[in-house]
């Protein structure tokens, strides 16, 4: 009897593994949305007795869509299922620990269009992606990976620039470490991340502030004299920075980034890399 149950469980596990691979490949190959939804919900594809394991949830399907940049499927899942698409995935999905796994995955894979869709939908989900100090936030990750476009999208959508991880590091701390250790190749991206963070931080709080004061000769070279003095608390924000900080405080996250793009100010004052590229728009 026991051996029979064990054999049945093994067959169920194997069948689920096979279907998972089929579904994974279908999303990877950018199959039509209707086909993917038929696969995801059709019970004929499943042999398990456990109804809870019969289908991939919208949340799990969205993770596949993010990984393979299936923009149309991601848009469908978020539009059709809303909050359910942003729910925690099941235990069978091994994601990086995060309070917002879908945002984190979109940042990690640099899926800017899907990131924008998730941010738009997440505004309707109370408490979504709220920093709790246990994990690094998606903004921490965007800074770690030097993704300035993701940084500005997250900040404009209400991400907290001063959120701390379990070590007390803010996204600004992450960028400063990157700048200190950066090569010529990634220094420009790190600098853009820093500039974005500063514009959304009228009050600068970060763990490395004391370190900046101890080695001014190093940090003034890395940051430039004006930025160094501002971050070290030795001078107020430069006029252009102060102006943008004031302007950005007036913008609603609900209308970002369109509200920023439409501001009647010189383009040189606007952040680079505002989403979404024309190529991405055409792909959906």
Question: What does each of the following model-derived ranges do?
Answer:
Residues 40-49, 76-89, 116-126, 152-160, ...:
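Ankyrin repeat domain, specifically the short helix-to-loop turn at the C-terminus of the second helix
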Residues 122-146, 258-268:
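Eukaryotic modular interaction domains in large regulatory/scaffold proteins
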């Amino acid at each position: 009897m026991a051996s029979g149950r064990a054999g049945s469980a093994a067959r169920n596990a194997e069948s689920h593994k096979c279907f998972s691979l089929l579904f994974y490949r279908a999303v990877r190959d950018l199959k039509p949305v209707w086909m993917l939804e038929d696969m995801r919900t059709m019970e004929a594809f499943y042999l398990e007795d456990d109804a809870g394991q019969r289908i991939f949830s919208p949340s799990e399907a969205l993770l596949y869509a993010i990984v393979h940049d299936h923009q149309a499927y991601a848009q469908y899942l978020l539009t059709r299922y809303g909050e359910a698409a942003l729910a925690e995935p099941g235990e069978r999905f091994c994601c990086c620990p995060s309070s917002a796994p879908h945002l984190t995955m979109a940042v990690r894979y640099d899926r800017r269009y899907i990131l924008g869709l998730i941010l738009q939908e997440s505004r309707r989900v109370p408490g979504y992606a709220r920093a709790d100090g246990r994990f690094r936030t998606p903004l921490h990750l965007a800074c770690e990976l030097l993704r300035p476009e993701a940084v500005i999208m997250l900040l404009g959508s209400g991400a907290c620039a001063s959120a701390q991880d379990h070590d007390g590091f803010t996204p600004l701390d992450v960028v400063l470490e990157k700048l200190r250790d950066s090569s010529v190749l990634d220094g420009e991206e790190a600098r853009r991340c820093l500039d974005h963070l500063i514009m959304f931080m009228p009050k600068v709080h970060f763990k490395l502030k004391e370190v900046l004061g101890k080695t001014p000769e190093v940090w003034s070279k890395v940051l430039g004299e004006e930025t160094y003095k501002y971050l070290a608390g030795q001078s107020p924000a430069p006029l252009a920075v102060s102006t943008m900080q004031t302007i950005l405080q007036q913008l609603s996250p609900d209308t970002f980034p369109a509200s920023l793009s439409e501001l009647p100010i010189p383009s040189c004052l606007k952040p680079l890399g505002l989403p979404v590229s024309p190529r991405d728009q055409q792909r959906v």
